[in-house]
C-alpha cells in the first residue's frame, strides 16, 4: 500500500473531504490517504487540521517537511486558493516523489512556469488538471473539424473557469491569440480568438448551470451536456499516476491554459477590449 500525503491551505474543503473515499473506491487498499498538513484552520467552518485528521483517519503532520518525508506520493490541494500553490509546492517538488497539484494550477503563466521549472530541476513527476478533462463526452469526441465553440458553466471565473477552459482548449488543440472579457454581477463571458483564426466563447453563471458546449464543425453543429461521471474518471487517472503510470497532462498544455487565464484576469480590468495572450 502506498501512502498519500495531503498538503492543503486548509483541509476542511470539498476536495480533501471527498478524495479519500473516492480513492478507496477506485483502487481499494493500493493507496491510502495516510498523512495530512493544513496551513490554517478553515476560514469557513473553523475546523482545524487536527480535527480534520481525527475525522478522516489521517495522521497530522506539523510541517510539510515531515509529511513529505513520511509519504510515498503527494497531493497538493488548495483548490479554492490557487495563489497558495507556489508556496505549498516548494518542498514537495524538491522531493522527487510523484505529486499531483489540484486545480486551478496557478493564477497566471509566470507562476505556473516557476512551479514546473522547480519540478523539472529536481526531477519530480507532477501534473495538474481539471476533472472535466475526463468527461466521457469530451474524451470520446468524434466529429468533423471544429470551427467554433460556445461553452457554458457554473460560478465565477476565478475558481471555476478552468473546468470550461481546459476541455475547450483540449478539443480545439490550438493556442489562443487574444481574449476579450465582458460581465456583470452574476455572469461573465470571455471571447477567445485562436491563432488559426477560430473563435470561442466561455460563459459562467453564478446562479448555477450545467457544464455544456455548443460545437460548430465543418459538418454539423452539436450540443454537448456533460452528464458522465467525470470525477470518477479523473480519480482513476490520478490513482494510476500515483501507482506508477505516466504523467497525465503535458506541462506545455497546462502552461498554455494558464497563459489564457492570466490574460483574462488582465482583460477583466478593461472590459470590452482585446488583450493579447
For the regions a language model picked out, list residue spans one by one.
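C-terminal helix-rich "cap/oligomerization" subdomain common to oxidoreductases
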Residues: 51-55, 66, 70-80, 241-277
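Glycine-centered short loops/turns at secondary-structure junctions
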Residues: 96, 123, 271-272
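N-terminal Rossmann-like dinucleotide-binding module
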Residues: 1-53
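Beta-loop-alpha module in the N-terminal Rossmann-like domain of NAD(P)-dependent dehydrogenases
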Residues: 55-116
